[in-house]
Each structure stands twice: as C-alpha cells, then as structure tokens.
C-alpha cells in the first residue's frame, strides 16, 4: 500500500512538473514556419498629375511567409527574441516576453507593404506590437500596426496614416 502511494505521489509530482513546463518561455521556444497577413484601415492621400484625392480605405497587407525562431534570452524574466526570415525578403527580429500562457510582443519598428488598388504597392514604416497564444503546435500572433508614411507609387505620391489594423501571424512548429 505504501509503495502504491509512493508511486502515485511520484506520478503526481511528474505531472505537476510537466504542467509547469507548459507556461512561460518553454511554451513558445522553437523553430516555426510562419505566414503573416491581414489588413489596415488607413487614411490615404494620393497626389498625382490629376490632382489630389483623399479617402479612408481598408488596405490588404502583402502576405509574408518564412521561418521563425523563438529563443529564450536567458535573463530569467521570461524574455525572448523572435527572429523572422521572410522568404525572398528581409530578416527581422524583435523582443517578446512570456507571461504564463501568453507571449507579449514588445513594440518594434518594421516596414510593411500595402496593396493600393490601381496604384500599386506602398511601403511604409510602422511600429508593431501585440500578443500571441499557443494552441498545440501553432502559435497565433495578433498584431497591432501603427504609423504613417509617404511612398512613391509610379507617378504618384501616397501619404498613408494607419487608423486601425487587423493582422495575424500564424506560426506552425517545425518537426
């Protein structure tokens, strides 16, 4: 009987330790394949040879995909570094902080490409932030983009100011 209680206590302790490993940096650490897409609501002013036009539009982001690594910083405070190697494009990195079962993305500067109908693609600087949760082998980032900028599109100059954003990055853990 004492042996059975001892085995049950050891099993319970092992389960407790395993459950603790499912929070914080250990929950997110790994190598992933990611895809980012979404849209922003933006005030858009376009200046060209025909004059100026201004409106508020929902603009699609140019989809990005590639490889992502989420690494512990070793600081013991839940600090992490996220690196994104965009297929055929840039590499970016930013800091995040694991808090329980959430990953908080610290604000970082990046560039985004917006599809503007009839005019082409505008590239502007933004500040991104947000949070993420892990579901099985998938991490879902909900991102917020803020910023404004000017971009040359063919013969036109576009001034873009982001009012709202709906952006997700889905990252699937690689085997």
Language model features with spans:
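Bacterial N-terminal signal peptides that target proteins for export
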Residues: 1-9
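C-terminal motif of bacterial Sec signal peptides marking the signal peptidase cleavage site
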Residues: 16-19
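Short, solvent-exposed aromatic-acidic interface loops
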Residues: 37-41, 84-92, 144-152
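Flexible, membrane-facing loop/turn or short amphipathic-helix motifs
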Residues: 38-50, 111-123, 148-160
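Predominantly extracellular/secreted and cell-surface proteins with exposed
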Residues: 52-135
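Edge beta-strand at a domain terminus
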Residues: 140-175
């Amino acid at each position: 009987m004492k042996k059975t209680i001892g085995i049950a206590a050891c099993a319970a302790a092992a389960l407790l330790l395993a459950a603790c490993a499912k929070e914080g940096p250990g929950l997110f650490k790994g190598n992933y394949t990611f895809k980012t897409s979404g849209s922003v609501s933006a005030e858009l002013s376009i200046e060209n040879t025909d004059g100026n036009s201004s409106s508020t539009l929902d603009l699609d982001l140019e989809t990005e995909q590639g490889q992502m690594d989420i690494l512990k910083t070793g600081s013991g405070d839940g600090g992490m570094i996220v690196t994104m190697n965009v297929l055929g494009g840039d590499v970016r990195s930013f800091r995040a902080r694991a808090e329980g079962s959430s990953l908080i993305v610290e604000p970082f500067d990046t560039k985004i490409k917006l599809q503007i109908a009839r005019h082409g693609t505008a590239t502007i600087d933004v500040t991104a932030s947000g949070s993420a949760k892990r579901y099985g082998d998938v991490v879902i980032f909900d991102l917020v983009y803020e910023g404004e900028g000017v971009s040359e599109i063919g013969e036109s100059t576009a001034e873009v100011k982001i009012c709202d954003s709906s952006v997700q990055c889905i990252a699937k853990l690689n085997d």
